[in-house]
Amino acid sequence: MTDSLVRATAAKGGIRLVAVSTTESTKEAKERHSLSYLTSAIVGRAMSASLLLASSMKVNHGRVTLRISSNGPLKGLTIDAGRDGSVRGYVGDPSLELDLIKNKSNHYTFDFKKATGIGYLHVIRDDGKGEPHNSTVELINGGIGEDIASYLLHSEQTPSAVFVGERINQDGIVCSGGLLAQILPKAERDYSLIDLLEDRCKEINSFSELLNKKGNNLISLIEEIFPDLDQSPSDIISTSQEVRFKCRCSRERSLSALKILGKDELQKMIKEDGKAELTCQFCKNVYLVKEDELISLID
């Protein structure tokens, strides 16, 4: 089953809803980076959030980079997501595992706050025109959802509800995904609609349980959470696209990166090793560059 993203409008166009499933993408990230249960959850949540943000980019080649820099044992996180549904990412310490903690609902959950520690969430939007737009906010709790909502409120002045979650058991990743709900400008003074949206969001005790219940049926997930935004499910207008873990690295890019090192550094590689080996941080692909290729980079 492939991952997907659904964009929808409801309440006669007054609310923007985006839902995404990242189960398979998270599984691939786990395999490529040998992620622990904890870091699988964090990466899955961050990939979901990044795709939700990228979904609003106006150009198909637009991209969003989400980065956490903090003092926690996670040692940072970087996710790159595209409007086209591609996503990739990595964490500083992929093997990190911490004791579970009880949440407000008395359920055991991952200790995201301890993992990330105190620090910042950086969001970079790049539409390919001029300099990318950078925003930074303080981390709220490291669980990604509230952190992204804080970013949207303070950096984009857009009141939003952001939910991310996952279900992981001893057999691995069962599900991973997210949901974004925003009041659009045409309805920003419709206080009854705003109150309704807030009430529905407050009723969500465990987004992860809802996600597990609905699987990849994202429209059904939206209808389960917001049953009274419209008179009937058909009033929700939606479009869907495929989501996948996809890295933009290539042999050509690796050679270009080596060339930037300069003649002296390349000659040192040739003399000491007779080759170069480059590993992509995002996907762990390894590119072996032989001596004759290094020589050609100098010429």
UniProtKB/Swiss-Prot annotation:
GO CC annotation: cytoplasm
Key words of the record: Chaperone, Cytoplasm, Disulfide bond, Redox-active center, Zinc
Cellular localisation: Cytoplasm
Post-translational modification: Under oxidizing conditions two disulfide bonds are formed involving the reactive cysteines. Under reducing conditions zinc is bound to the reactive cysteines and the protein is inactive.
Keyword Zinc: yes
Disulfide bonds: 247-249, 280-283
Major site of localization recorded for this protein: cytoplasm
Matches recorded under Pfam families: HSP33
Xref: SUPFAM superfamilies: Hsp33 domain (SSF64397), HSP33 redox switch-like (SSF118352)
CDD domains: Hsp33 (cd00498)
InterPro entries in the record: Heat_shock_Hsp33 (IPR000397), Heat_shock_Hsp33_C (IPR016154), Heat_shock_Hsp33_N (IPR016153)
GO molecular function, one term: unfolded protein binding
PANTHER family: 33 KDA CHAPERONIN
Similarity field: Belongs to the HSP33 family.
Primary role: Redox regulated molecular chaperone. Protects both thermally unfolding and oxidatively damaged proteins from irreversible aggregation. Plays an important role in the bacterial defense system toward oxidative stress.
Protein name stated in the entry: 33 kDa chaperonin
Organism lineage string: Bacteria, Bacillati, Cyanobacteriota, Cyanophyceae, Synechococcales
